[in-house]
Structures are given as C-alpha cells and as structure tokens.
C-alpha cells in the first residue's frame, strides 16, 4: 500500500501472536508477495471501472462483484473497512461511486499486494509461517499451530479453539464463554 506494507497493515497482530507463542527471537526471515491477480488484464471481459456500471452478465460472472460480496460482509462488519457504513444501504454506497468499495478490484488504483507468505526461523531452529491472501471464500483469520505433542487451531469467525493433544480426545474451547 501507499502508507505502509500490507503485511503490517493486515497482519501485525498475527505476527505478534506468532512471536508470543514461540517465546524466542526470530533469527531468519523470508517473505514473498505481490499484486498478482487484481490487475486490469485479469478483469472479466466487459467489466467497468465501478461494479454498478457492469452489465448483469458481468456481475453474474465476476467472483469479486461488490454486489455479491459486500451485503453479507456488512452484516458482520465491526471495525474498520465496511463498519464505517453501518446503518447505510450498501447498494446506495456502491451506486454513489464516491468510495473505493464501489470500484472494480481489477480497475482500481490499489497498489496493495493480494498475497504474501512469511517464513520465520527462530533461534532454536523451530519455524513458523504466515500466509496472507485475498483468495479465500471466507474473509477471516485462521490460526493453526502444529507442535511436537499436539496442535491447536481456530478462526476468528466462530470463536472456537480446537486443542488436540496427540493420543487424547479433542477439546474445544469456546472463547466467547470462557
């Protein structure tokens, strides 16, 4: 992005969590990412600069059509991004063409990367990786920690943390009730 690296803007808390869980210093890091897909040459044929100006046929074919994506996401918006529109009709916002959410992801002036991987090696030889991607059916965080004695995984959507100690029955913790 123009103001800061996307990985910091979108994943600083994820990186903090990794460092906290590892409880040691990162000794080596590698990272790769780029604006791979959301470029004009990958736009659906006949697409317009704003989703509201696309034909019904293009809207139907386009996986990233704002009219498909935003109404459902508006219901879950809590902070940032779409939350600033709470109480407003998303269809009116898209038709106004005043906000970047109405702009076609392929034709926008966005320079933020759409995918990135970060690999970290820690001082004892253990490692961790982080994948940030725009290419997911659901837009929420998924955390999966693999250890020598078990694994822990969960996501930011349902508030459930699955704890699997190898050889034992899975324990599910509902963080909303704990």
What are these regions (language model features)?
Residues 80-86, 92-97, 107-112, 117-120, ...:
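Generic detector of short, locally flexible boundary/turn motifs and exposed helical patches
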Residues 6-9, 106-110, 133-134:
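Short Gly/Pro-enriched turn/cap motifs at secondary-structure boundaries
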Residues 14-16, 53, 89, 99, ...:
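Acidic-enriched, low-complexity/disordered segments with a strong bias for Aspartate over Glutamate
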Residues 1-103:
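Predominantly a Rossmann-like dinucleotide-binding segment in NAD(P)-dependent oxidoreductases
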Residues 112-178:
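C-terminal helical cap and adjacent loop that interface with cofactors, partners, or active-site loops
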Residues 32, 36-38, 85, 91, ...:
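Phenylalanine-focused residue identity feature
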